[in-house]
């Protein structure tokens, strides 16, 4: 039975197209794509099945982008690696696997592998060989080739702070300034989508539409309890405000204690 109380974002990406690019051994039928459709009922979410060979996958994606002219592309893991190279469109790379060859071998994904989701072509198994790994290594050498100031504005990176598989935050940050850590692992679960991905999508949608939200400033001292721990109401209040306002936190910035600023940023 459908959950009538599930929060959605009917005012987000209205009439726009989003391409979702799945990860390794996944498919367009992934639950992640359906979550995005549920959250943004006024948007069209396109989620293709990718060929296992990276050159074929990249060709499919480029043709799809040319045909559909999406307003936003979201890619996770392997899909995040492909997404980075789809220049000219606003993009979000979630836990992008920019070192796919090493990721496959280090994560014991060689040999016979089973797709995690149903593919339209009916294929459910594949043999991952050394030759295929080399194809991925060759593909990742093309990442970051066309980064310029405009692309840096278009691209966001989201990185789980407990991701045991992909560790590319520093590599991404060498090329793109909009890199964000979130509380989560490698797999993009619904909690991470709701709390971390949706606010970035909202920011991109606002920018595309030229919307200026009113600003709310919150003193950091109001966020903590008597023991310096975040108040239990903090997260919920922040998300409620974020639906309608640009929210900023105000913290002291002592010039003689530069480390204090980093500590406060980490706490928030």
Annotate each predicted stretch with a short phrase.
Residues 210-227:
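Asp-based phosphoryl-transfer active-site loop
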Residues 86-87, 241:
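Aromatic pocket-lining residues of Rossmann-like dinucleotide-binding sites
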Residues 90-199:
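The alpha/beta-hydrolase serine catalytic core
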Residues 74-84:
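Gly/Ala-rich beta-loop-alpha elbow adjacent to hydrolase catalytic centers
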Residues 12-67:
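Active-site catalytic motif of lipid deacylating hydrolases and related acyltransferases
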Residues 225-249:
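Short, acidic loop-to-helix structural element flanking the phosphoryl-transfer center
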């Amino acid at each position: 039975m459908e959950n009538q109380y599930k929060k959605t974002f009917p005012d987000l990406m209205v009439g726009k197209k989003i391409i979702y690019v799945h990860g390794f051994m996944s498919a367009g039928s992934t639950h992640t794509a359906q979550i995005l459709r549920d959250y943004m009922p006024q948007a069209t979410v396109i989620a293709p099945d990718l060929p296992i060979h990276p050159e074929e996958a990249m060709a499919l994606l480029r043709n799809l982008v040319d045909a559909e002219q999406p307003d936003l592309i979201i890619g996770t893991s392997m899909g995040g690696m492909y997404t980075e190279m789809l220049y000219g469109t606003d993009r979000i790379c979630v836990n992008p696997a920019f070192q796919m060859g090493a990721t496959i071998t280090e994560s014991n994904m060689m040999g016979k592998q089973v797709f995690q989701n149903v593919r339209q072509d009916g294929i459910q198994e594949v043999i991952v060989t050394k030759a295929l790994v080399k194809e991925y290594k060759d593909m990742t050498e093309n990442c970051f080739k066309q980064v310029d100031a405009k692309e840096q504005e278009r691209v966001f990176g989201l990185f789980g702070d407990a991701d045991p598989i992909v560790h590319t935050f520093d590599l991404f940050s060498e090329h793109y300034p909009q890199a964000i850590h979130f509380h989560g692992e490698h797999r993009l679960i619904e909690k991470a989508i709701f709390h971390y991905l949706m606010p970035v999508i909202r920011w991109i949608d606002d920018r595309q539409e030229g919307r200026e939200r009113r600003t709310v400033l919150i003193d950091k001292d109001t966020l903590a309890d008597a023991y310096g721990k975040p108040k239990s109401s903090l997260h919920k209040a922040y998300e409620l405000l974020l639906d309608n306002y640009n929210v900023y936190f105000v913290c002291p910035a002592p010039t003689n204690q530069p480390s204090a600023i980093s500590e406060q940023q980490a706490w928030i």
